[in-house]
Amino acid sequence: MDSQQLVWRGNTLLDAATAAADAQGCGGDSGVGDVGADGVGEAGAGDSGAQLAHVLSDVIYIGDEESLLIERLTRTVRFRCRGTTSGGEVFTFTQPGFTVSTLVGDCAGRSYELRRISPWRKGRVIMRGDVEVGVVEAGARELVVSLARLDSGDELPLIDVVFLTWCCVLVDMPQREMRG
């Protein structure tokens, strides 16, 4: 699968070029990824090594224009998270079963299923219908996201990628240190 690589490092989503440069001590562009006319952009934007999103006090900031308020719903044993955009769109991420092996995301009407690759690893495949659109792999300090290269018009909206993968950080890397 030809793919684009992204990395959640701490509270920041970086493209692979920035993540690799930071790992080598080379710095990297601290700018924000390319943004479309609606202020959100597509998941393929930001190939120059940019910060695509960051989280501060339960708000995800995507580019300069979009923000997503995140609420973890803790009334039940199952994991549930809801996000609301500044424009009022609602995003949900739920654990429908007893375990977190399968998670379901709804991003303003766009449905996704995130399934564990193996019972012994924290990797997940992201499905939209019956099409694999990405893979998420949780490491000790970062969450690596590989997005499939899809036909033009079929790309995942960047806001969907950010919300779904941040929820994977919350589920699969709960001992993270929050900064900011």
Model-derived features: positions:
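Intrinsically disordered, low-complexity proline/glycine-rich segments
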Residues: 1-180
